[in-house]
């Protein structure tokens, strides 16, 4: 890699996130976009939602507007249906991703297609560059089987967006971004190349 990848980066902040709710009462943990970390450009928001109590998610996210950024929803467990004002619709299931570019504006909903069981996943908001904020809205539904997996010593990398070890993920961001789901067994480690000019964060959701 270039010089930008030849030094270790220091962790400058550790936060626990804010337990809150959004939509029609969906319980979640807000990591970015809360009082501890308002934003980390280009990351505007990062939420984890997860519960096996349907009362925590059954209300879903009724129609609401987005504009000027991208939303990436990564579903670990469960099933959601998304639908928008242009007539587009699709489903999020175990391990799948929905990549929505809101651009000049869209109204959409994300509603659970289950009445019991575990519903767990993440939503990330990415800011669009100023010159792209008024582009037409678009969607990319990415099934779990389209996300490459890389076996590493003591672990696994799912490449949602970006490139690592020559493997590219299916996500296509208008802003440069890497998005990996990494599993490591105890006492193992991994080095991830990140340009020195980029902001980055790690979220530990198990372990």
Which residue stretches match the model-derived regions?
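A short glycine-rich, His/Asp/Glu-containing loop-to-beta-strand
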Residues: 22-76, 147-191
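Short, structured patches in soluble enzyme cores that scaffold and shape functional sites
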Residues: 123-130, 159-163, 183-186, 205-206
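Long amphipathic alpha-helical segments that form oligomerization/scaffold cores
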Residues: 128-155
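Short, solvent-exposed loop/turn segments at the edges of secondary structure
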Residues: 40, 67-69, 101-103, 119-121
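Ligand-binding loop in jelly-roll beta-barrel domains
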Residues: 103-132
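Glycine- and acidic-residue-biased ligand/ion/polar-headgroup-sensing regions
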Residues: 67-87, 94-97, 192-207
